[in-house]
UniProtKB/Swiss-Prot annotation:
It comes from the Bacteria. GO terms for molecular function: mRNA binding; structural constituent of ribosome. Belongs to the universal ribosomal protein uL13 family. The gene is rplM. This is Large ribosomal subunit protein uL13.
Amino acid sequence: MKTYSAKPADVQRDWYVVDANGKTLGRLASEVAYRLRGKHKPEYTPHVDTGDYIVVVNAEKIAVTGNKASDKMYHQHTGYIGNMKSISFEKLIDKAPERVIEKAVKGMLPKNRLGRAMIKKLKVYAGGEHRHAAQQPQPLDI
């Protein structure tokens, strides 16, 4: 018997909606990354994007443990000397709550062309409403 290898045209992708209200950031992000990669499917193939679409709602209500709300920092460099920008979790969750989940999940995906394709299947919304009702996403309990 030959080893099965999924082909990109044969992959069936489902849509799921996840409520982030009260969930811990890292635990939610690891489960979302796992499903974006498609590792929960029996036809998972490492070199093919077999993952599902994930819609995360209520990103503004995500929780972190301990003092991470004030201590956790997000850094970015503009490319110019001395231009390292830093922002705390508290300020980022007020300014752009979607970015917190996007950055956490992106850090758990492969750092290559396949990882960039996987992150495009993640849709994050600050509030409880999303605009993907036409895809009929199934609720996913994490």
